[in-house]
Design a protein with these regions (language model features):
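A domain-level signal for the structural core that forms small-molecule/cofactor-binding pockets
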Residues: 2-232
Length: 232
């Protein structure tokens, strides 16, 4: 029963084609045995990649286990959101609370789909439950960020994915707003090579879409983005 609930929840949240970098694996979710098999295949492939770059990884003591380390990092950490399902989300009656629920500075680790460089930053999430509606367990917002962050990503699409997931699990809400503030290693380590630049993206629905709405102002006043990309 629990496994069915997990599958139904994850099916509800996913909208991207399976197999895409920002989607889930074609046979999602993977069992531990399937993950180990994937790690073995990726290890062999990454070894060939290093050899193509004229890296003698087998005789270099600092690179001898690099192919497997990289494969494990992708499957278990960097792209874990593509392979591991999220647990069921617990919701509770709002008990008449009609204000904003805001969680600020949720840590984000993701990866640029273009160059496979890390994206690091924070996510701010706000929502207002509908009349007689439900609020969700606070840590579930963090888990949603992990689910969609731990895979290949374009920040604009990632912001939409997080917003849409929160919107679905807080059904009947009056509005959802998500702001992502992040730095991209593909900007600082290659190409233009600029350190310190951060990207800010926001997606809003319901009452938060109206610039004159006090709820929108309250959210942005609460997160107070400064030049460093974090709450003041």
């Amino acid at each position: 029963m629990a496994e069915k609930k997990i599958r139904n929840l994850n099916k509800k949240l996913e909208v991207v084609q399976k197999g895409f970098a920002n989607g889930v694996a074609t046979n999602f979710p993977l069992t531990e045995k399937q993950k180990e098999k994937m790690i073995e295949k990726a290890t062999a492939a990454y070894a060939k990649f290093l050899e193509a770059l004229d890296c003698d990884w087998q005789n270099d003591p600092n690179s001898a286990d690099t192919p497997r380390r990289v494969a494990k990092a992708y499957v278990n950490d960097l792209w874990a959101g593509r392979y591991t399902a999220m647990s069921p989300i617990t919701s509770f009656p709002s008990d008449g609370y009609d204000g904003i629920v805001i969680e600020r500075n949720i840590p984000l680790t993701s990866m640029c789909s273009h160059h496979h460089q890390t994206i690091k930053g924070v996510v701010h999430i706000g929502y207002i439950a509908g009349e007689g509606g439900q609020v969700i367990g606070l840590s579930k917002l963090n888990r949603i960020v992990e689910l969609f962050g731990r895979r290949g990503a374009i920040q604009e699409q990632l912001t939409s994915a997080i917003h849409n997931a929160v919107d679905k699990v807080t059904g009947g809400n009056r509005g959802v707003i998500v702001t992502v503030v992040a730095t991209h290693n593909c900007v600082s380590c290659r190409g233009v090579k600029h350190d310190g630049a951060s990207m800010v993206t926001t997606k809003a629905s319901g009452v938060f879409r109206q610039n004159t709405n006090l709820a929108r102002k309250e959210f942005f006043d609460s997160i107070k983005i400064n030049n460093g990309g974090h709450q003041i």
